[in-house]
Amino acid sequence: MTTTWWELQILCDPSLEETIFWRLDDFGCRGMAGEQKGQSYLIRAYSPQAEFDHLDLAALALLLKQDAVLAHLPKPVVKWHLIDEEDWSSSWKSHWQPEEIGDRLLIYPAWLEVPTHSERLLLRLDPGSAFGTGAHQTTQLCLEALEMRLGQQPETQVIADIGCGSGILSIGSLLLGAKQTFGVDTDILAVTASNSNRALNNIEPERMVVAQGSIDTLPKMYPEPFDGIVCNILAEIIIELIPKMSAIAKPDTWGILSGILIEQIQPIADTLEQNGWAIAALWKKDEWCCFNIRRN
């Protein structure tokens, strides 16, 4: 029996991109992709028709528009229509191509044939419904920051990945030479995606450990303090996590935080200072930024 899917198309202000991806993930979409369209951003997302009806999609569209109003941004244009299984499986993937990030990494979709030669570290990925394809500015900023942090003696570094999504930051860390990563995500689909992508990149399970949970879960997975902490989620959640980060940190632990809009810099900076963290560098890409931090 052929499954029928809803394809949602959301044309939005680029500043809404991460919020919309979060909403779609929370809604239960199984595949998401985005691309620049002039001054706007077009997001496509897919959900089984059997699980959602028109009223569900209308309610989702209303939430997306309310998010825009609260952010003082134009309301997104939301449309949806039905497609069959074959169209779904190929549609969102066709909009995602290999992506060079920094000086060393190449993010490569799992369904493409592996290149016979590449001077870059090949990070193969099939995100499924989890956030993190490498296309988003915040993911790129985090990977570039990891490349800098792991440039010297990476083999000693044990890293916590909070909100691991597809596992892209954990895998990137390990390809760049880190000793071990421990990732957590509240979404079980993200845990599944991370483990699948770990296997796709031939990484041993003991080097990349993933579990459902949040920052409080990490000490149960690894009782020692971490050398590094990476976190690429919404700024509001990062503000809640910062007071808990010292409990899993050493005096010289570093951190990489993103998912933060430029207008959200000040509340993040204030919360870091109040909790004993110093900003070593602040990187920006378009309307997004990435905090490189260390213990103060």
From Swiss-Prot:
The keyword Ubl conjugation does not apply. GO terms for biological process: methylation. InterPro entries: Ribosomal_L11_MeTrfase_PrmA (IPR050078), Ribosomal_PrmA_MeTrfase (IPR004498), SAM-dependent_MTases_sf (IPR029063). It is an enzyme of class 2 (transferase). It catalyses: L-lysyl-[protein] + 3 S-adenosyl-L-methionine = N(6),N(6),N(6)-trimethyl-L-lysyl-[protein] + 3 S-adenosyl-L-homocysteine + 3 H(+). Keywords: Cytoplasm, Methyltransferase, S-adenosyl-L-methionine, Transferase. SUPFAM superfamilies: S-adenosyl-L-methionine-dependent methyltransferases. S-adenosyl-L-methionine binds at T139, G163, D185, N232. Methylates ribosomal protein L11. PANTHER family: ELECTRON TRANSFER FLAVOPROTEIN BETA SUBUNIT LYSINE METHYLTRANSFERASE (PTHR43648:SF1). Belongs to the methyltransferase superfamily. PrmA family. This is Ribosomal protein L11 methyltransferase. The lineage of its organism: Bacteria, Bacillati, Cyanobacteriota, Cyanophyceae, Oscillatoriophycideae.
